[in-house]
Amino acid sequence: MENSVKMDTSGNSTPLPQRQARANNQPNKNIGKHGPQKQNEGASDGGPAEKRQRFGPNNQNGGGGSVGGGGGGGGGSGGGGGGGGQNQNKNFANKGGFGGGGNRNRNRGGNQNRSNFQNQNQNQKSTTDAPKADGGNLNDKSNEANNANQSNSNSAAQAQAQLQAQAQAHAQAQAQAHAQAQAQAQAQAHAHAQNQAFRARGGGGGGGGGGGGGGGGGGGGRDRNRGSRGGGGGGQNSGGGNNSQRGDDFFIAQRLRSISGPTHELPPIEVAQETKFSGRNRLYVGNLTNDITDEELREMFKPYGEIGEIFSNLEKNFTFLKVDYHINAEKAKRALDGSMRKGRQLRVRFAPNATILRVSNLTPFVSNELLYKSFEIFGPIERASITVDDRGKHLGEGTVEFAKKSSASACLRLCNEKCFFLTASLRPCLVEPMEVNDDNDGLPEKALNKKLQEFNQERSVGPRFADLNSFEHEYGSRWKQLHDLFKSKQDALKRELKMEEEKLDAQMEYARYGQETELSRQELRKRESDNERKKLEWEMREKQAEEMRKREEETMRRHQTEMQSRMVRQEEDMRRRQQENTLFMQAQQLNSLLDQQEGFGGGNNGGGGGGGGGGGGVGGGVGNSNFDNFGGNSNSPFEVFRGNNNSSMAGNNAGPGANNQQQDSFAAFEFGVNNMNQGGNQRGNNGGNNVPWGRRRF
């Protein structure tokens, strides 16, 4: 059975060899990995992946409570995921979560609750039946090699055992479902008690066990319980007394900012009709029997008006109820107080009203309208009035009646914790509960207990006046003196309080003036510092501007100097070029004249030679004279050569004048040195003319 191979009926593939099964077959534990879960195949049948069984056999039929759906059923086939929240109940085949191969049920919200039913435990579904979006059980060769020991024959044998186990576990699953529901209720209550604002990700949770019971509940599977993230835990629990108080304080502060402006003109308060079922119409009914019902109380008070809410404490035999209007409450009190019911005398009184507050330490400029508007920020007000004497003088106190007890409690708390001012004066209003006695009937005779011994002793003597100097007169006078002392001390205390108030008022005004003066000084110092800072900034900007201006001037001056030097150089270059051009033109002219002169000088030399030696000498002299005269010209270009000894007519010295003229004429040229023989005649063939090109006469 271990090495049996399932053959492919299509005949398209040959069976693959199987490895021997190991004794300790390890399940596929890919829990908590980021990659997709590999398919745990029991045996490869050689067919395509679509035709193979998706899930291997479940080798562990033990309870899957630890990994299954949040304590959902054990047994062979594990529980389905519970709805609601993000429970990831990843119950795999080998974890006892889902029977016969354990489909991976990932519950991500109530609309994706894919439960596995009992008929899915036969492992005959194709891979298309399972949700593919989870990336759950994919083909992997390595996982196939590791888990090839689980054959289909073994899975068939175990499937039959699982069906039997499911039938046995189904009854247990029902009991576990009830237990789990109770556990979830306790977990939710605990989560609400802990004000941890975590999102509720728990599943709905049902029973685990046979064929798709509930998982997920109470944070099962991979639902990591973080604070109140239990199964079906309810949202963000941001309630609580502190949060409620903070919310009330926030809205009170908002309403206070809206009226923080001047209160010179306030509209008059419309006198509204009496509020129905107000706190002033609440009656206390005592000495009742413990068998009385609300219907009997309504029938008892029905002739006197409409009855509102009723609060009964039958253990202590008393009841609180509200009548529609105050006049009807008075009628009911007078009629039913002292009446008998089942052998007991009823006691009917007005209940203490916790919505009425006494406001004292008010300035004389606080009116009914200002008092109403100031205390309206705490909640709706039924009545607000200033207490005055018979002449209409302000007594420095008033009464505020709220519509709700919560508003009165908030007002009392905030005014005691902080200083609440109504005007510009720094006298905070003092708020305290006020006990209002609306009982105008007093104490009738029927309300007294005449069975007491003290009653009989006190009533034994009637009204009388004491005689002077008698025992009764002496002690009666002492009682009067005691009350007079109390009254005098009370008056003295009031006068002292008045003086202290005036003193504190003067100190307050002086301190206010000093504070305003100090604030003005601080403002002045601040402005002076700002002015000094602005002055320093202005000076810095001026300095920077001056430095920039100097840099710009220096740059401009440097540019101008460079431009001037450039212009001078350009002018010098231009003048030199002009002189060179002029000299070049003159040199060309002299060259042309020289060519002409050389032509004439050659003819003269020929004639002299024909005349003999003397004539030759004369002719040579004449020739030399012409040439030398040409060379002595101030425009001669041959001055640029060294050794040019110019001689005048027949070898005579030209004299210093000619030499000076030649030097002045060629002063601009520094190409060579003018060596002129100025001393005596030089006669000969050359005629004293040492020209560089060595022209000789024969």
Swiss-Prot record:
Role according to the record: Required for normal vision and courtship behavior in Drosophila.
Disulfide bonds: none
Protein's name in the database: Protein no-on-transient A
Keywords for this protein: Coiled coil, Repeat, RNA-binding, Sensory transduction, Vision
Source organism superkingdom: Eukaryota
Compositional bias annotation for Basic and acidic residues: 518-561
GO process annotations (BP): visual perception
Molecular function terms, GO-annotated: RNA binding
Residue segments, region Disordered: 1-247, 515-571, 597-698
Low complexity: compositionally biased ranges: 108-126, 145-197, 624-636, 643-660
CDD domains per record: NOPS_NONA_like (cd12945), RRM1_p54nrb_like (cd12332), RRM2_p54nrb_like (cd12333)
Coiled-coil spans in chain: 484-582
UniProt feature, compositional bias: Polar residues: 1-29
Bias (Gly residues) ranges: 61-86, 201-220, 228-242, 599-623
Source organism (scientific name): Drosophila littoralis
PANTHER family the UniProt entry points to: RNA RECOGNITION MOTIF-CONTAINING
Limits of the RRM domain: 281-353, 355-441
